[in-house]
């Protein structure tokens, strides 16, 4: 097989070794399967960027802590007595023992190392060292835990191991402005699940940051006219013309894709447009999301869709009617429902890749999220998290915890649509090891979010500033 020319280090890729050099629309598979590249990511990328460690609700009280692990680095996020949040490397300054494991709350207001009983105040200061006078020549300031930069946005706690990281809101641009009306910080978990996948973490991310795969993987979503649970039989070629158009929008540090009209559609889908104008057809799609995704539509929204399905066509588009009914039901049940114009809605709605590990699909009432974390040593494994957040009425927030399964196949509650993605992922990554596969050739309109993530990574790994 003829090798694919991805450029040379001196021609177009700066300091990027040829083995890892991307073309304009090409990404070599080595960036997904090489242990050496994984180590570069862990050493040069994850040590420099802001990354979501946990949700604020996971550390609700003073003394609450959450252990966030990325590669071999363990970071503890701790709620302070005044409600503020600090983060520290999770290593006792005596012999390196982890001070906390998992989640919990500091007993007596101190963080205690279980090895020799050293203690730290919630702000990281050394508060107790047995036989302190027997330690010689160590300055007092070196006894404290080493702090990690921490900040909050949208209800997430972000951490950065960089010595001088950019301001968090600057790093997140344009998300804070685009998503402000949705008030993500006021959402709470509806459910959350975690498992391990036999794939590189980017293989999994890539499956959730482009919509080009929709007709091939999720053909049932092309058939709302069939009802809330349409057929998932593979789509014939002629049905692909009705696939959603999902152009990607690259930003400096992140990306987004949206659903919109295909520029060249003409009149070929006029029949589909007539179907979409029928309230029950749009309602079927919303009901499907509730029944087979378990997110993007709340239980209230599901009732709104059922109500919409009984209505006759009118001058008001079903999409607008649906949102009106959703808001009316939410307000009637005491939900502090976010207020926004349709312009604001479309500016924030969509599928966001919050580089490097978080993907969120945002609606007014709820959010579907994914987080993918690399394995510390194996580029062919990763942690996969899937969760749903929601705006609840006071007193209605459910108690949740992470449902953890060793193999995703051991849990039958993923829903039809996520299960289709999960079935693909193992096979996608396995195929990357084929001698007949060189790398990813990307759709220039609907898959450039993937190219953008590699351009962002190259800034940190190789010092090359691309066009992202």
Q: Can you annotate each of these PLM segments?
A:
Residues 48-59, 129-134, 352-356:
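Short Pro/Gly-enriched beta-strand edge/turn motifs at strand-loop
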Residues 84, 151, 156-468:
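C-terminal catalytic domain of Rieske-type non-heme iron oxygenases
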């Amino acid at each position: 097989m003829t090798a694919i020319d991805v450029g040379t280090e001196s021609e177009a890729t700066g300091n990027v070794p040829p083995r890892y050099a991307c073309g304009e629309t090409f990404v070599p598979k080595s960036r997904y399967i090489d242990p050496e590249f994984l180590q570069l990511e862990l050493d040069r990328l994850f040590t420099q960027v802001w990354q979501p460690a946990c949700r604020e609700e996971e550390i609700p009280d003073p003394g609450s802590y959450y252990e966030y692990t990325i590669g071999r680095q363990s970071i503890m996020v701790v709620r302070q007595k005044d409600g503020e949040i600090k983060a520290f490397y999770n290593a006792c300054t005596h012999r390196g023992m982890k001070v906390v494991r998992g989640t919990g709350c500091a007993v007596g207001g101190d963080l205690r190392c279980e090895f020799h009983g050293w203690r730290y105040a919630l702000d990281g200061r050394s508060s107790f060292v047995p036989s302190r006078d027997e330690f010689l020549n160590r300055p007092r300031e070196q006894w404290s835990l080493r702090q990690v930069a921490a900040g909050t946005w949208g209800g997430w706690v972000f951490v950065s191991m960089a010595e001088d990281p950019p301001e968090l809101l600057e790093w997140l641009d344009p998300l804070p402005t685009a998503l402000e009306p949705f008030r993500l910080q006021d959402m709470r978990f509806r459910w959350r699940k975690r498992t391990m996948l036999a794939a590189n973490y980017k293989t999994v991310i890539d499956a959730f940051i482009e919509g080009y795969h929709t007709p091939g993987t999720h053909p049932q979503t092309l058939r709302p006219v069939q009802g809330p649970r349409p057929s998932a039989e593979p789509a014939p070629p002629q049905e692909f013309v009705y696939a959603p158009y999902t152009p990607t929008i690259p930003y400096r540090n992140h990306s987004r894709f949206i659903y919109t009209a295909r520029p060249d559609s003409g009149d070929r889908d006029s029949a589909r447009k007539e179907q979409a104008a029928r309230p029950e057809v749009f309602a079927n799609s919303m009901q499907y999301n509730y029944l087979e995704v378990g997110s993007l539509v709340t239980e209230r929204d599901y009732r709104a869709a059922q109500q919409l399905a009984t209505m006759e066509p009118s001058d008001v588009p079903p999409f607008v009617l649906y949102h009106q009914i959703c808001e009316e039901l939410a307000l009637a049940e005491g939900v502090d429902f976010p207020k926004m114009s349709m312009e604001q809605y479309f500016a924030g709605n969509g599928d966001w890749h919050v580089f490097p590990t978080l993907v969120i699909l945002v609606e007014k009432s709820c959010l579907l999220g994914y987080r993918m974390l690399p394995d510390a040593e194996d580029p062919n494994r990763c942690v996969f998290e899937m969760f749903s957040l929601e705006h609840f009425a006071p007193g209605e927030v459910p108690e949740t915890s992470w449902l953890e399964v060793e193999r995703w196949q051991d849990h039958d509650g993923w829903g039809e649509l996520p299960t289709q993605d999960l079935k693909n992922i193992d096979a996608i990554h396995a195929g990357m090891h084929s001698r007949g596969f060189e790398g990813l050739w990307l759709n220039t309109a609907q898959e450039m979010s993937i190219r953008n993530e590699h351009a962002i990574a190259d800034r940190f790994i190789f010092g090359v500033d691309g066009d992202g």
